[in-house]
Amino acid sequence: IYVEKYWEGIVEQKLNVYEMRVKLYLLQDIPFKELQNAVANFVDSALCQNESLISFHETNSYKFYSVGTLWPLERGMTYKKDQIYTLTVRTVEPILARYFSEVLKNHYTQKMKGLTVENRIIPHKMISEIYTLSPVIMKSDEGYWRSYMSLDEYEERLFSNLVKKYNSFTGEQI
């Protein structure tokens, strides 16, 4: 899939990965076990400020954006009130990148407030390894996967979802 969109005055004719580094000010302490929910609430509530993005948010489909965790990592198990952290959001959708860039810098929830957004396009290069500090999240009506699925079934589901995402993204079938 190739796009030709303007983003900060740059015209590209290739698939771009847009990265937004959002500086966040914490309005209250957030225990590590609540962090992903707080971050998801921050991003989701920003999406829901726009009528057309509400249906995008509520649709059961691939969103083609990812959200990291706060940086710097806290050695303790609590992210501290009155501290500034960085949240990284990435997407391949230029319109979504522009929206996040404009909205997240002034957005706030009860737990955090966006201050600034730094934008960049990730340089193209061969990927030699993939690592993450954010786990894979698999939503299911049955709840947490370990209560109803073996490790082999979980790995098969992850692979199947990856193939579906690739097919959806490229328009090809593998």
Feature-to-residue mapping (PLM):
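RNA-interacting cores
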Residues: Y2-I174
